[in-house]
Each structure stands twice: as C-alpha cells, then as structure tokens.
Design a protein with these regions (language model features):
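Broad hydrophobic/π-residue packing in well-ordered secondary structure
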Residues: 5-7, 18, 68, 92
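A broadly tuned preference for mixed-charge, low-complexity surface segments
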Residues: 2, 25, 151-155
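N-terminal export/assembly leader peptides and their processing motifs that target proteins to secretory
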Residues: 35-155
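N-terminal leader/signal peptides at the extreme start of proteins
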Residues: 1-13
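Alpha-helical protein-protein interaction elements
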Residues: 11, 28-30, 131
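C-terminal juxtamembrane segment of a hydrophobic transmembrane alpha-helix
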Residues: 15, 19-44
Length: 155
C-alpha cells in the first residue's frame, strides 16, 4: 500500500534563504570594492593632473630664467617656445600671468591656483597674461627690455 502524506519540510526554504543572503552579501562586497577602486582612480587622476600643471609651470619658469639670462647680455632679442602638457583640468578657466617675481596660474574654479617664484634677475621688466584655453604652446619672449609670455610666435 502506498500512502502519500505531506510532511512539513523547512530544509528547502533555509537553503533558498541562504542563496539570497549570499547573493546580497556578494552585491554589497562588489559595491564596496567598486567605490574603493573609483576613489583610488579619482585620487590618482587628480594627483597626476596637479603634477602635470606644476611641471608646466616649472618649464615656463625655467624658460623665463633663460630669457633673463639672455637679457643680461645686452640689447638682444630672445624667444623660446614651451609645450603645455595636456591636463584634465578645465583650462578654459586658467589665466597665466607673469610678474617681476612670480609666474601665477589663476583658476576661476579656485582649486588649482598656483604660483612659481622666479628670480627676476634679468635686466628688464616681466609682464604678460594669457588665457590657456585650447593652447599647446606658450612663447617666452624678451624684446626691447621686457620679458613677456604670449601665445603667438614672435616675428
């Protein structure tokens, strides 16, 4: 004789709940890992961006120093092009200014304002201000006793 009786079996439900909790734990761990990896990538990109901008300013300051050295030779004209390394910053907001003591980068957004000191040991004045929107080359020019920065190649 074959008797069919229903039995209350909770083992299957416990297994299903275990699958669900394991899945949710995996989703949570992957989400945390994704946020951690994104944070590392963002911090690295920002650091590289700041280092590229600082290297650009250092290159321009070195070119200004070379123009000052040429100005001490007498009535000479000197020009040098400096390549502006590409950055991820919004360079439409950047204004680069040259004074007698400093090379100043002004960022309208305010997060990347930088200054590089220069010796000012040339025989003339320093002047110039350029907007860095879409440029790849900056010219350092010493002519008629003035060292300046400009975007156009001198004639």
């Amino acid at each position: 004789m074959n008797k069919n009786t229903l039995q209350k079996d909770t083992n299957g439900a416990a297994t299903e709940l275990g699958y669900i909790f394991t899945f949710l734990l995996g989703v949570m761990l992957l989400s945390m890992f994704s946020m951690w990896a994104w944070d590392i990538e963002t911090a690295t990109r920002e650091r590289w961006n700041e280092q590229a901008i600082q290297a650009n300013l250092d290159d321009i300051a070195a070119a200004v120093e070379r123009a000052d050295e040429a100005s001490r030779m007498g009535d000479v004209q000197y020009s040098e092009s400096v390549y502006w390394r590409a950055t991820e910053a919004d360079e439409n907001q950047f204004i680069l200014s040259l004074t007698n003591e400093q090379l100043i980068l002004e960022d309208s957004a305010g997060s990347l304002d930088l200054e590089v000191s220069i010796s000012g040991a040339g025989s003339g004045q320093h002047s110039g201000s350029v907007q860095l929107s879409g440029i790849s080359t900056i010219w350092i020019v010493h002519s008629e006793g003035v060292t300046s920065i400009q975007l156009e190649r001198p004639q």
